[in-house]
C-alpha cells in the first residue's frame, strides 16, 4: 500500500460523534496524484499510450475497444468534452489494427446543429465542481417528468434557494429547450438506433462515460450494439492506466469482492468523515443481492441497487441474466452518512440521519445542497406513496438506494471533469464508495426494458424516476458478517479494497510486472485532519473546495508533494 501517514485525529473527531472511529492516532493512506499524466501535444505522442488501449477487451460498464475485430466498422459517439487530438489518436490506433472507425457527435445523432449544441452547453455548464450544490438542480431537471412545477413549488417556498439552483442565466429559450430535450438519453438512444439502421455495416457504438445500464436500455431493441463506454477521450484519461489495465486482474479483484455476499447477514460501514451505518439481511435479501451485485467497475454493494432489475451476467457481461430480482424485502439502513462530495462537486460537510425504518429522517449541514435536500423532503406525495414493487410499509422515496464500490486502482480525480462540473470519474477508483438516496427501478418482471410501471407512476404523481443526492467517501471501512461462519470479513479497509491484497490476485498481477505497482492506488484525496496535517472540522469540512483547489494548482504547476510514483525533481507544467 506504500507509505502511510499517521494523523492525530482527536480534534478531527470532535463534532462527529456518529463516527465509531476512536479519537486516537489512526493511520490513513497518504495523499497521491498520478505523476505520469503529462499533457500530449501531438497524435504521435499519444499513440504509444492508446495502442495498448485499443487492444484491451475489458472496459468500464461494457467491453473495451479491443472487442472490435479487424475488418469491422464501429462508431465513437462523442460527447461535448471530447478532445479532437485524443479522439484522433484513438481512431488511428484502431485503424492500425484494421478496425474502421466513424466519429459522430451526440448532437449529430439527433439533428441538432453544432452552434445550438455549443450554445446549450455554455448555458447549462455555467458552473464548476466548486458549486457541488448544483447536483440538486440536476436532480430536478433530469428526474422529474415535469420539472417546472417542482421549480415553481420551491420558488414559492424559498425564492432565495430557487435563485441559487435555477438562476436566470441558466434559463433556456424555447429553441434551446427543444435542444435539451433532443439531447436527453432516451432521444439520443432513438437517434443512435436510426443511425445504426442507416448504417448496417457498423457493428456497434462506443458511447458515454457512465451509466452503461441506462445507455443499453435506451438502445432497446438494439442493445447488443452497445459495445461499451467511450471514456478515454481527454488528455487526462488517455495518459492514465485506465484503458490499458489487465482485464483479468481487474475481473479477479471484483470476483473476490463479490464472493462472500450470498452468505452475508449484516454489514457495517464507518468512515473518518463521520459515516457510521449498518444493516441486517435475511437469506432472501442476500441471495438477490449476490445475483444482482455486478456491474464492471461499479459494484452494487447494497441490495436495493441490485434489485428491481435483471442482474448483469458476470460470465457474459454486459448481457443480462434471465431472472428478475424483486426489490422487496427492502434493505433497511441504520445510522448516519456523512461527507463533502457528490457527483457534481464539493459542499460543506453534511450528515444524513436514517430512521429505524431506513428512511431519511434528518439532514444536518451541507450548505446549499443540504438546504435543497431538506426542502425537497417535503415535496407533495414524495413521502406518502409507495413506489411500484414496494410494499405499503415502505411508502416514500427517501430510502438509501446506492452503496457502490469503485474497483479500479488507477482511476483518479480528473481536473477536466471538475472544470465541467462533474466529480464522477473519481468514484471509479478502488475503495471509493459513492452513496445515493431515493428509488429507481430498471426493469419490470419479464421485460428487459425501462420499467413502464415506474414511468407511469412517476408521470401520474410527478415524482422522481431515479436516485440522486450522492455522497462520496474515501477512507471507509466496509465489513460484512457471514451468517453460518459467524465471522466478519473486511472488504474495504480505510479506503483500500482488500481484494487487491489477495494472494491469488497478486499472483496473477505478477504476470504483468511488479504487483505492488500494478495494485497500488495512484490517486488518493488530500483531506486535512484525516491523511494530511490540519483540523478536519475547521480546515476542511466547511469549505472542501479550498483544499481541492490548492492541490489542483500544485499539480498543474508540477510542484505537488505527493506525486506517485514520485515525480522528477524538476517541476513540470501540464499545459492545462
List where the protein language model places each region.
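Bacterial signal peptide processing site
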Residues: 15-17
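Internal helix-turn-beta structural module
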Residues: 417-541
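Sec-dependent N-terminal signal peptides
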Residues: 1-6
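Dual-mode signal for accessory low-complexity, basic/Gly-rich regions
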Residues: 345-346, 361-437, 441-446, 512-525
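Active-site bordering "gate/hinge" segments
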Residues: 23-344, 364, 482, 492-575
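Glycine-centered positions within short beta-strands or beta-hairpins
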Residues: 74, 357-358
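Hard-cation-handling environments
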Residues: 352
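C-terminal motif of bacterial Sec signal peptides marking the signal peptidase cleavage site
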Residues: 11-13
Amino acid at each position: 500500500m506504500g507509505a502511510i501517514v499517521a494523523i492525530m485525529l482527536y480534534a478531527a473527531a470532535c463534532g462527529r460523534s456518529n463516527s465509531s472511529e476512536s479519537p486516537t492516532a489512526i493511520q490513513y493512506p497518504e495523499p497521491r496524484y498520478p505523476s505520469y499524466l503529462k499533457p500530449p501535444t501531438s497524435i504521435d505522442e499519444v499513440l504509444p499510450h492508446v495502442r495498448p488501449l485499443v487492444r484491451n477487451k475489458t472496459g468500464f460498464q461494457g467491453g473495451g475497444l479491443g472487442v472490435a475485430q479487424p475488418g469491422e466498422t464501429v462508431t465513437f459517439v462523442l460527447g461535448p468534452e471530447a478532445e479532437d487530438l485524443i479522439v484522433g489518436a484513438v481512431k488511428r490506433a484502431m485503424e492500425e489494427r484494421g478496425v474502421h472507425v466513424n466519429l459522430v457527435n451526440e448532437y449529430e445523432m439527433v439533428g441538432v446543429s453544432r452552434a445550438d449544441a455549443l450554445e446549450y452547453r455554455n448555458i447549462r455548464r455555467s458552473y464548476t465542481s466548486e458549486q457541488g450544490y448544483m447536483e440538486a438542480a440536476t436532480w430536478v431537471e433530469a428526474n422529474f417528468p415535469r420539472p417546472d412545477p417542482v421549480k415553481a413549488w420551491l420558488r414559492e417556498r424559498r425564492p432565495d434557494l430557487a435563485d441559487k439552483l435555477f438562476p436566470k442565466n441558466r434559463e433556456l429559450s424555447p429553441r434551446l429547450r427543444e435542444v435539451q430535450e433532443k439531447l436527453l438519453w432516451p432521444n439520443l438512444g432513438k437517434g443512435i438506433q436510426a443511425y445504426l439502421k442507416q448504417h448496417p455495416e457498423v457493428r456497434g457504438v462506443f458511447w458515454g462515460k457512465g451509466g452503461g445500464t441506462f445507455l443499453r436500455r435506451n438502445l432497446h431493441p438494439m442493445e447488443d450494439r452497445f459495445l461499451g463506454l467511450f471514456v478515454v477521450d481527454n488528455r487526462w484519461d488517455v495518459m492514465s492506466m485506465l484503458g490499458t489495465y489487465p482485464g483479468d486482474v481487474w475481473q479477479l479483484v471484483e470476483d473476490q469482492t463479490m464472493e462472500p455476499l450470498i452468505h452475508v447477514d449484516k454489514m457495517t460501514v464507518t468512515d473518518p468523515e463521520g459515516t457510521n451505518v449498518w444493516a441486517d439481511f435475511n437469506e432472501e435479501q442476500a441471495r438477490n443481492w449476490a445475483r444482482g451485485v455486478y456491474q464492471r467497475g461499479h459494484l452494487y454493494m447494497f441490495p436495493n441497487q441490485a434489485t428491481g432489475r435483471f442482474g448483469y451476467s458476470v460470465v457474459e457481461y454486459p448481457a443480462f441474466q434471465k431472472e428478475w430480482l424483486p426489490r422487496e424485502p427492502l434493505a433497511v439502513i441504520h445510522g448516519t452518512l456523512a461527507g463533502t462530495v457528490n457527483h457534481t462537486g464539493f459542499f460543506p460537510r453534511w450528515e444524513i440521519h436514517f430512521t429505524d425504518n431506513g428512511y431519511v429522517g434528518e439532514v444536518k449541514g451541507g450548505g446549499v445542497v443540504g438546504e435543497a435536500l431538506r426542502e425537497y423532503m417535503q415535496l407533495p406525495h414524495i413521502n406518502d406513496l409507495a413506489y411500484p414493487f414496494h410494499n405499503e410499509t415502505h411508502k416514500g422515496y427517501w430510502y438509501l438506494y446506492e452503496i457502490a464500490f469503485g474497483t479500479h486502482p488507477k482511476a483518479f480525480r480528473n481536473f477536466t471533469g471538475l472544470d465541467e462540473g462533474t466529480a464522477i470519474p473519481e468514484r471509479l477508483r478502488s475503495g471509493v464508495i459513492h452513496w445515493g438516496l431515493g428509488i429507481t427501478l430498471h426493469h419490470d418482471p419479464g421485460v428487459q426494458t425501462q420499467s413502464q410501471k415506474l414511468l407511469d407512476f412517476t408521470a401520474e404523481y410527478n415524482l422522481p424516476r431515479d436516485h440522486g443526492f450522492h455522497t462520496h467517501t474515501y477512507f471507509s471501512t466496509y465489513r460484512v458478517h457471514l451468517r453460518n461462519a459467524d465471522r466478519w470479513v473486511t472488504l474495504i479497509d480505510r479506503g483500500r479494497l482488500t481484494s487487491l491484497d489477495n494472494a491469488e490476485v497478486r499472483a496473477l498481477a505478477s504476470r504483468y510486472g511488479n504487483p505492488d505497482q500494478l495494485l497500488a492506488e495512484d490517486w488518493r484525496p488530500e483531506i486535512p485532519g484525516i491523511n494530511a496535517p490540519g483540523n478536519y472540522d475547521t480546515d476542511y469540512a466547511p469549505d472542501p473546495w479550498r483544499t481541492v483547489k490548492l492541490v489542483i494548482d500544485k499539480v498543474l504547476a508540477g510542484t505537488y508533494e505527493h506525486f506517485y510514483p514520485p515525480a522528477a525533481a524538476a517541476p513540470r507544467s501540464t499545459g492545462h
